[in-house]
């Protein structure tokens, strides 16, 4: 069978090794003379959760993080976040949104800079134009906010 779904392949990957690979890539980019040294991360769904985790793991080496409907990190990890966060959520995403109240409380309690948006009438994956969940107007708005956020935080 030549085709396997992303979820099947995802289950075959060691999550700790994948996180280490992502961290290595971020460290490489931060040290490369071909970059500004100001790193921003973004991701969607699983990648949104990884964006939150990278903000924790990278500390001051991450300068902006934009998770799209990603799992939140545990409250005890929030103090390690140094980057400002722009967080995008679908309004109809009970599994992911269930973690938001505790995450928001931890971000506030630790004085973290963040902005969160819930897009009315959208479902998890609203930015993916290859699925029926795609919401063009919400995706366009979220993407414009993302680009503006990166411009504000990654350019001197």
Predicted segment positions?
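Alpha/beta-hydrolase fold nucleophile elbow
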Residues: 33-44
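Short beta-strand/loop motif that positions the catalytic acidic residue
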Residues: 81, 86-89
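C-terminal catalytic histidine-bearing segment of alpha/beta-hydrolase fold enzymes
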Residues: 104, 108-156
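Alpha/beta-hydrolase active-site loop
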Residues: 6-33, 144
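Gly/Ala-rich beta-loop-alpha elbow adjacent to hydrolase catalytic centers
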Residues: 43-47, 51
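Short, small-residue-biased leader/transition segments that mark boundaries at the very start
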Residues: 1-2
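A conserved short beta-strand
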Residues: 61-71
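Acidic catalytic loop of the alpha/beta-hydrolase fold
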Residues: 92-97, 124
């Amino acid at each position: 069978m030549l085709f396997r779904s992303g979820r099947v392949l995802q289950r075959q990957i060691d999550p700790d090794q994948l996180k280490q690979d992502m961290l290595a890539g971020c460290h490489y980019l931060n040290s490369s003379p071909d970059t500004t040294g100001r790193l921003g991360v973004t991701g969607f769904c699983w990648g949104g959760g990884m964006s939150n985790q990278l903000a924790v793991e990278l500390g001051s080496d991450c300068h902006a993080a934009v998770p799209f409907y990603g799992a939140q990190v545990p409250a005890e990890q929030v103090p390690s976040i140094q980057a400002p966060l722009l967080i995008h959520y679908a309004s109809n995403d009970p599994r992911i949104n269930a973690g938001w109240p505790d995450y928001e409380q931890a971000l506030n309690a630790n004085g973290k800079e963040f902005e969160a948006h819930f897009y009315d009438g959208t479902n998890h994956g609203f930015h993916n134009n290859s699925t029926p969940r795609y919401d063009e107007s919400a995706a366009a708005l979220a993407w414009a906010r993302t680009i503006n956020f990166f411009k504000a935080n990654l350019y001197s």
